[in-house]
Structures are given as structure tokens and as C-alpha cells.
A protein has these predicted regions:
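Extracellular/periplasmic juxtamembrane helices and adjacent flexible linkers that interface
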Residues: 251-332
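N-terminal segment of the mature folded domain
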Residues: 23-151, 291-293, 329-332
Length: 332
């Protein structure tokens, strides 16, 4: 029994020593299901930066629902960079003066180094025969999703369902609102974040389907095994983007602008793009996307700009206080 505190104190010493010998420390505030991609990315960047500059970096992560994360940054969490799954979350920080107004022009691809798609995770054998969005709104179905007010994952689910309904014969905003209302009624709860939704579905065994990022399916396979679930690609789904930005006020205060800039730029390097692909995120690099084509089925997608006039407009219409989500959820 005496060995336990000894080992623990040794771990603390190691952590303190790691921090003490670092030339700089960066904090990346990110969305909930980005844990794995940055767990792999950070050591790669540390090695690259050491070779390039001679500096040792300590890299820290903070994960949670994307909207909660940016609110934490606005409230004083000193993140050097934000890596999110909704452009309007970064716009929120820009409006607060923490991020540059033209943040989306600071990096390629509107500052989104990779993409994904919203998919359904169902039980092995697909016992409820779920094939498309219409099935998720059927009576008696249980659907696990994160909270659309607080998470990019939840918003992307909501907007994907809305867009699908609009594209149906005779589709209108009225019919889309009615359809999404039916789907939301089938959610027994709203998870706090994407990883919480996965835990609810896989460990707590709640729900008939989990709606999440395509990349999350690989994490589920690694943690729970491929034998317990199947991935269903709906007939239409959102191409999700993952915008990144420097938190200017923080990097200028800490003197870490150079390191933070390089940290984000490296996401577009061959190594950074390969890491994204290995974590089942669709890389921007065309050659790598072709190399990993077998794990990325062709799927009909739309962008939030095409269907909703951009993430900020979608937020104002659907997710601000009193928006369509609140109207639907009150009815729920």
C-alpha cells in the first residue's frame, strides 16, 4: 500500500519536471471528440518544433462541448489556440476581441485543416433497420445526440436533419421544423458532448442510434471493438469543418505567438494531414485523401454555407435564445 503514494509523487515530479524544462507551454482548447487526434498530433509537433527551433514545448489540452469551451476562453481560460467544430464558436471569440476578425483568412481552407461527415452508429445487425434520417424520427426510436445549444456535434446533427427535410419533395422550413421536432422527441436526453454521447450509447447501452462524426466511429472501434456496432451513411449529410485560430490576446500576453502559429500551421503539413487521416478525419491534401479513399466512402454532403448561409447565420436563426431549436424544444 505504501508504494501507491510513492509512485503518485513520482508521477507528479515527472510532470512538474516536464513543465519546468519546457521553453514554452501552449494550451489548445478543443471540442470534445478531438482528444484522439491531438493526443497523436502533439508529440509529432513537439518533435518537429524541437528540430526546427531547438525549443522544448509543453502542450496541454482542454476538451469539452465546443460552445462551452469558447465561453471558458472568453471567461479567462488562457488557451493559446482554439480548434473547434463550428465557425460561429470562433466568431464568438472574435466578437469578444480575443481572436482576429479575419481569423478564417489566416490559414488555408477557411482555417479548417480537415473535414468529416455526420453518420449514424447503430447496434450490430442494425436491428431497427435504420437507413436514413426519416428512420430516426419514427415513433418509438431512441436517438442519442449531444445538446445542440452547446455542442458543434449536436448542431451539425440538427442542421443535417433540417437540410434533409428541406430536400424532400415539397420540403419547406415548416416541414423541416416539424421533422426535426419529431427527431428531437426521440432523444431521451441530450449528452453534454460528443464523447459523452458515445459513452451513453456504447457503455450505458441507451438508444437505437448515435449521430456523430464519421471519425468518432474509429475511436469507438478502438475502444469497444468493431463487433458491437455498424456505421450507416445517410442519403444526405453535412460536411463538417474544424476551424482553428490563434487567441491573440493570450499569445501576445504569454509571448507564444510564434509557437502557436507554427502549431496550427503544422496541421496542414504532410505529417499533420496524415495524422488526420489516420484518425479518420478527411484530409485536405488530395493525395492523402486518395491514399485513404477506402476508409472514406463517397457520400452526398452539403456545407453550412450552401444550405444555411454560413455557421453564424445558422446559429442566429436556430440556436440563439428564442431560435427555432428553443421553439421546438419547448414543444418537446
Amino acid at each position: 500500500m505504501k508504494k501507491i503514494p510513492h509512485l503518485f509523487s513520482g508521477l507528479l515530479v515527472a510532470l512538474v519536471a516536464s513543465s519546468a524544462f519546457a521553453d514554452a507551454t501552449l494550451l489548445n482548447a478543443s471540442y470534445d471528440v478531438a482528444r484522439d487526434v491531438y493526443k497523436d498530433y502533439n508529440p509529432m509537433f513537439q518533435k518537429y518544433w524541437k528540430q526546427k527551433s531547438g525549443e522544448s514545448l509543453e502542450l496541454k489540452q482542454s476538451h469539452g462541448g465546443s460552445t462551452k469551451q469558447v465561453r471558458a476562453v472568453a471567461d479567462g481560460l488562457e488557451a493559446d489556440v482554439v480548434t473547434m467544430n463550428q465557425a460561429n464558436d470562433i466568431e464568438f471569440l472574435a466578437d469578444k476581441g480575443l481572436v482576429a476578425k479575419d481569423w478564417a483568412k489566416k490559414f488555408p481552407n477557411n482555417a479548417s485543416p480537415y473535414t468529416s461527415a455526420m453518420v449514424f452508429i447503430v447496434r450490430k445487425g442494425n436491428p431497427k433497420a435504420i437507413k436514413d434520417w426519416s428512420d430516426l424520427a419514427a415513433p418509438g426510436m431512441q436517438v442519442i445526440v449531444p445538446h445542440p445549444k452547446n455542442t458543434g456535434n449536436g448542431r451539425n446533427t440538427y442542421l443535417s436533419a433540417w437540410a434533409w427535410a428541406l430536400k424532400q419533395p415539397g420540403g419547406s422550413d415548416k416541414s423541416a421544423q416539424e421533422f426535426v421536432g419529431k427527431l428531437l422527441k426521440n432523444a431521451p436526453l441530450f449528452a453534454a458532448g460528443g464523447r459523452d454521447a458515445t459513452t451513453t450509447f456504447m457503455q450505458r447501452k441507451m438508444g437505437d442510434a448515435l449521430v456523430t462524426f464519421e471519425s468518432e466511429a474509429e475511436m469507438i472501434a478502438k475502444e469497444f471493438g468493431k463487433g458491437d456496432f455498424e456505421v450507416i451513411y445517410p442519403s444526405l449529410t453535412m460536411q463538417t469543418e474544424f476551424p482553428v485560430a490563434l487567441v491573440d490576446k493570450v499569445v501576445d500576453k504569454k509571448g507564444t505567438r510564434k509557437q502557436a502559429q507554427a502549431y496550427l500551421e503544422y496541421l496542414w503539413s504532410k505529417e499533420g494531414q496524415e495524422n488526420a487521416a489516420q484518425n479518420y478525419l478527411r484530409p485536405r491534401d488530395a493525395d492523402l485523401l486518395k491514399k485513404y479513399a477506402a476508409q472514406f466512402p463517397v457520400v452526398k454532403t452539403f456545407t453550412v454555407d450552401e444550405m444555411f448561409g454560413g455557421a453564424t447565420k445558422a446559429f442566429l436563426v436556430h440556436f440563439k435564445d428564442g431560435g427555432t431549436f428553443d421553439q421546438i424544444y419547448v414543444q418537446k
